């Protein structure tokens, strides 16, 4: 059989398919057109903006016909790897070292317009093989069936880890017939919105997915606030700990272990530093370096008109030509780490936009640790299609070095929860509601360059795996490291140490993987780290600094500290960020002094500022005092103002009166109106939410002093308009007996008892599983994903408004603590019972020092009854009309 090929012509285009969420939508289109849809907004006019005579039909195409609709960047071609009936409804895949493809089939996605039957066990994990070597898969084996909406998989040991939220399974074949006969559970809480034990229904847009074995030997996931690590022995012997919830659908890492992710309208974010560092200081809210938006240009360049997007009737959603204007379904990012495209592509990110039938290539640049993503083809895309049914949902690296595209080939991709009447009409007008059981997998290759043919047998030797750690294709390096760690291949430790310390005699990536493989095996030693700290490559030295932290809690702590401090005097900028992070783990006066010197002798950088602040929990005011008294800092002027402001902000958020009084003393020390004074006061003022006309008054939790701090009166006399303005902003935060206009202390909230205490306890569990992934355990929310709940006027105010927010969701712009958020919260009316909603709301109204009254089940029941006919989410304006 000959591969179906599409050769690139003209402008570069590639279409990628969308998240699993979209399959739910297919069935929705079959419902009666005149009926109001879940995604409709009250009184909203849904006018068709694209003339029907310019909208082409959308017939079902054969793979050969679909291939002819592709326009790919010059020098590339698109080859068919698999198609129905060999594969159905694919949403994710992984290649293995033998060249087989393990594919997730989410065949239960939206079997009817209202999703009826979606919870039936019809999903599969299938294994596809190319038995004749022609590049096209020709053999299908159902490895594991009977799954309910499976999302993704990860190769592990002699089987696979399967994400079937809320369960995470391990399955393997023990008798050699290619079908799983052992299936054991690793976790039963692998989801935020899909847990039958708690009465929640699935929302495919917000279920955990994409478990990824990262460079640091932890397994991270998209849309999930926990990371996992295998402890050896049994395949179910895992530990887990909280982490940042990343993105929505899809997760990838680069050669240095940095994680990349995205969400529908936010095409690319990255963790520039490991997120656990920023979590060290609970008052660093939010720290800069994790979940950083690295692509800010949201425009897309599709190959066809795109009226079939959910808000296509809104001005600005489509261009005047009727094409998609900005991202609305970004998903499935992958950092290209193969060797088939050529070195100039290594480290670039490819991502899907299925509603626009395209794939973007983002060129990644690094300047002093800051990553920036830009479209590699300005005004065009890497791959596009004129076939409206081309829906790539995921992208993957593979052992042959090519780029694989998972195409959920169908017309309907929007979930019925968000479906609008407009989109339903679009679907029905072109017959896009069926079929719903097709699917293709494509391979993008660069012409004129060989495609990798490397393979390993069923039981590769340790020597073979160690050799693969230096392979030019990152897929092989990752796979070899994971397999060595899974085997507990301690016998390979001497080879790994030799590779790690080989300097320029071996590839940088090979040395890096050798170090992390030793860490995963528990065979890393200080001698190896000492050698790595002298490596010619800053990336290796930085990794060695990070790895030294594993010795700080054991008997070799002092020796590890000495190794780190030996590097402190001559660290180039490329390595300095990691040194500052590691010094924050050591936490001694000496390391803080080193951090101060490093900051004062380098260009201002928010990354470095927050790296230091993250390691100063509880000691920010001491560090700030050392800066104010440092003559070098005094000459830095505004370049280091964010550092002083950030430290002051943390002290203010900590709420300790003694530390805040000292902070005010420090603010009064510099010359009146000096930049240091303004920076410190600005940091404090930034913690006080600003009231906005027509919006709920933000909650200000004052800090109570026994008497008026002396520095306050001194600062009020400063002859500076800016200082006077800042003092006025800070004033609501400061309280003391007899202060004019200050209300008397509110009586302490009575401890919850009886039914209320039980409700709070249940709410604690619900929050962890349902809410915490987005709003985070600390309640401070996440940039680009969820606003804060801690001290939120919406949480502590009207329980009638709060009940409606949870029942029906919120859309469009909403102000929280003086900051505007343009984010959509899904409705939970069908997902949670009245008692569960009351429990969760009681928790957030009494956690984090809150003292609002608990919410009763009857309150939610009454709110549900009063809004029984409502099918729309709420806007801020509507909520403000509710007492």
Task: Annotate each language-model stretch with its function.
Residues 37-465, 475-476, 483-485:
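Beta-propeller domains with acidic blade repeats across secreted/periplasmic ectodomains
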Residues 19-27:
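Sec-dependent signal peptide recognition
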Residues 41-57, 746-758, 816-823, 827-883:
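Flexible coil segments in periplasmic/lumen-exposed cytochrome c-class electron-transfer proteins
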Residues 680, 756-782, 795-808:
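Sequence/structural segment immediately N-terminal to covalent heme-attachment motifs in c-type
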Residues 427-429, 781-817, 822-834:
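Gly/Gly-Pro-rich "capping" loops immediately C-terminal to redox-active cysteine motifs
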Residues 395, 406, 441, 763-777, ...:
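The canonical Cys-X-X-Cys-His
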Residues 446-447, 775-781, 807, 811, ...:
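Detector for the c-type heme attachment site
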Residues 406, 427, 431-438, 444-765, ...:
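Long, ordered, helix-rich scaffold segments
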């Amino acid at each position: 059989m000959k591969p179906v090929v599409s050769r690139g012509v003209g402008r570069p285009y590639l279409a990628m398919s969308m998240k699993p969420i979209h399959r739910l939508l297919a069935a929705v289109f079959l419902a009666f057109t005149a009926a109001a849809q879940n995604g409709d907004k009250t009184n909203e006019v849904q006018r068709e903006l694209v003339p029907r005579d310019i909208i082409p039909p959308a017939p079902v195409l054969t793979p050969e016909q679909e291939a002819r609709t592709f326009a790919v960047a010059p020098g590339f071609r698109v080859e068919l790897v698999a198609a129905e009936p060999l594969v159905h409804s694919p949403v994710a895949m992984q290649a293995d070292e033998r060249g087989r493809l393990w594919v997730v089939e989410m065949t239960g996605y939206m079997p009817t317009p209202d999703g009826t039957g979606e919870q039936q066990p019809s999903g599969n994990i299938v294994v596809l093989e190319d038995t004749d070597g022609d590049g096209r898969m020709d053999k299908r084996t159902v490895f594991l069936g009977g799954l309910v909406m499976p999302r993704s998989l990860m190769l592990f040991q002699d089987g696979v880890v399967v994400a079937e939220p809320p369960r995470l399974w391990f399955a393997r074949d023990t008798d050699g017939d290619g079908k799983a006969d052992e299936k054991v559970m690793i976790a039963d809480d692998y989801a935020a919105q899909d847990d039958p034990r708690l009465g929640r229904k699935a929302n495919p847009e917000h279920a955990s997915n994409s478990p990824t074995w990262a460079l640091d030997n932890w397994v991270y996931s998209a849309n999930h606030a926990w990371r996992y690590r295998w402890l050896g022995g049994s395949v179910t012997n895992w530990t887990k700990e909280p982490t940042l919830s990343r993105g929505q659908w899809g997760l990838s890492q680069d050669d240095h272990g940095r994680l990349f992710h995205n969400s529908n309208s936010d095409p690319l974010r990255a963790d520039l530093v490991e997120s656990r560092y920023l979590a060290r200081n609970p008052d660093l809210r939010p720290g800069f370096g994790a979940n950083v938006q690295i692509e800010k240009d949201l425009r897309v360049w599709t190959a066809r008109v795109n009226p079939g997007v959910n808000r296509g009737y809104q001005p600005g959603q489509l261009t005047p030509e009727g094409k998609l204007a900005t991202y609305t379904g970004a998903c499935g990012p992958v950092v290209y780490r193969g060797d088939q495209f050529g070195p100039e592509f290594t480290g670039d990110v490819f991502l899907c936009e299925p509603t626009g039938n395209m794939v973007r290539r983002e060129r990644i640049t690094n300047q002093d640790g800051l990553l920036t993503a830009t479209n590699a083809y300005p005004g065009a895309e890497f791959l596009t299609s004129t076939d409206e049914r081309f829906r790539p949902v995921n992208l993957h690296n593979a052992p042959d070095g090519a780029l694989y595209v998972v195409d959920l080939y169908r017309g309907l991709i929007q979930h019925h929860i968000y479906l609008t009447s407009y989109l339903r009409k679009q679907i029905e007008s072109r017959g896009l509601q069926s079929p719903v059981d097709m699917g293709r997998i494509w391979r993008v290759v660069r012409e004129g360059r060989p495609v990798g043919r490397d393979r390993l047998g069923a039981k590769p030797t340790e020597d073979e795996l160690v050799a693969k750690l230096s392979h030019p294709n990152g897929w092989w390096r990752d796979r070899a490291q994971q397999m060595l760690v899974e085997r507990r291949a301690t016998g390979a430790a001497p080879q790994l140490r030799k590779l790690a310390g080989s300097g320029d005699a071996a590839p940088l990536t090979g040395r890096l993987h050798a170090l992390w493989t030793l860490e995963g095996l528990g065979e890393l030693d200080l001698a190896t780290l000492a050698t790595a700290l002298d490596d010619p490559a800053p990336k290796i030295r930085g990794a060695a600094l990070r790895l030294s932290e594993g010795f700080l809690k054991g008997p070799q702590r002092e020796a590890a500290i000495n190794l780190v401090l030996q590097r402190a005097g001559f660290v180039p900028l490329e390595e300095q960020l990691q040194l500052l992070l590691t010094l924050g783990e050591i936490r001694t006066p000496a390391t803080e002094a080193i951090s101060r010197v490093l900051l004062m002798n380098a260009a201002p950088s928010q990354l470095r500022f927050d790296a230091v602040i993250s390691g100063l929990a509880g000691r920010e005011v001491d560090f700030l005092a050392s800066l104010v008294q440092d003559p070098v800092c005094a000459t830095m002027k505004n370049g280091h103002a964010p550092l002083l402001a950030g430290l002051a902000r943390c002290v203010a958020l900590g709420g300790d009166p003694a530390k805040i009084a000292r902070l005010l003393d420090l603010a009064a020390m510099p010359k009146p109106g000096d930049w240091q004074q303004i920076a410190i006061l600005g940091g404090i003022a930034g913690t006080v939410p600003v009231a906005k006309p027509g919006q709920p008054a933000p909650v200000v939790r004052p800090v109570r002093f026994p008497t008026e701090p002396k520095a306050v009166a001194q600062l009020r006399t400063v002859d500076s308009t800016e200082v006077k303005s800042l003092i006025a902003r800070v004033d609501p935060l400061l309280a003391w007996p007899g202060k004019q206009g200050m209300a008397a202390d509110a009586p302490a909230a009575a401890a919850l008892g009886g039914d209320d205490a039980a409700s709070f306890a249940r709410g604690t569990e619900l929050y962890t599983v349902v809410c915490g992934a987005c709003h985070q355990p600390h309640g401070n929310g996440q940039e680009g994903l969820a606003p804060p709940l801690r001290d939120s006027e919406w949480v502590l105010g009207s329980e009638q408004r709060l009940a409606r927010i949870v029942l029906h969701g919120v859309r469009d712009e909403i102000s929280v603590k003086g900051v505007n958020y343009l984010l959509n919260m899904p409705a939970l009316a069908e997902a949670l019972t009245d008692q569960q909603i009351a429990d969760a709301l009681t928790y957030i109204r009494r956690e984090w020092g809150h003292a609002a009254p608990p919410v009763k089940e009857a309150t939610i029941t009454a709110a549900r009854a009063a809004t029984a006919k409502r099918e729309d989410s709420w806007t801020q304006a509507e909520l403000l009309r509710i007492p």
